[in-house]
């Protein structure tokens, strides 16, 4: 390999190494920032799973018994398996829009008030459920960023290894001299080319 080609390869490896290292750092930062934001936004809300089934904890959430909701995974479980279950029971299988329409259509003020109370509870519950699922969504994005950061770091290490190899080859002087000049009669000719 000629010296000029080796220098080009080394420069490209340095550029690739810098790009991959920056990408890895940015991905790790995105993971850390997102995870911290999720925790810092959920902590002040003081949302916690019930201690046990007697307090309303569904059986499939027993691993979270008594824990405060601080992670995206916990937020998703709380939103879907706890709030979702209770909203389904409160709304008797119907969504907020159904109960809101029932309240507006009711001619009896007592029935209208009862239906509106159900609609209000469903609205608040669905709003909280949506917010908790947003935290979970961002936690998934944070996990993807972590995986990308690791992949970029591994790729950067591979490029660094090849860069070290190229520099070592250059230092030991294993370049070839590029022959310049017309072809000699002993060199093979390509078929059809004179």
Give names to the regions the model predicted.
Residues 22-30, 160-166:
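C-terminal TM-helix exit segments that contain a strictly Trp-centered aromatic cap at the helix terminus
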Residues 113-154:
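Short, aromatic-rich amphipathic segments at membrane interfaces
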Residues 47-126:
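Long, solvent-exposed extracytoplasmic domains/loops
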């Amino acid at each position: 390999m000629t010296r000029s080609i080796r220098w080009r390869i080394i420069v490209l490896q340095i550029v690739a190494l810098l790009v991959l290292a920056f990408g890895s750092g940015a991905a790790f930062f995105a993971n850390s920032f997102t995870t911290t934001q999720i925790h810092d936004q959920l902590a002040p809300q003081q949302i916690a799973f019930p201690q046990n089934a007697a307090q309303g904890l569904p059986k499939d959430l027993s691993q979270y018994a008594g824990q405060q909701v601080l992670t995206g995974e916990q937020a998703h479980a709380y939103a879907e398996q706890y709030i979702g279950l209770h909203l389904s029971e409160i709304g008797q299988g119907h969504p907020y829009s159904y109960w809101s329409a029932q309240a507006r259509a009711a001619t009896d003020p007592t029935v209208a008030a009862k239906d509106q109370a159900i609609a209000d509870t469903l609205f608040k519950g669905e709003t909280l459920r949506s917010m908790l699922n947003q935290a979970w969504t961002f936690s998934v994005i944070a996990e993807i960023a972590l995986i990308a950061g690791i992949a970029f770091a591994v790729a950067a290490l591979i490029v660094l290894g090849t860069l070290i190899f190229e520099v070592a080859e250059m230092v030991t002087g294993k370049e070839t001299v590029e022959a310049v000049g017309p072809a000699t009669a002993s060199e093979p000719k390509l078929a059809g080319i004179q």
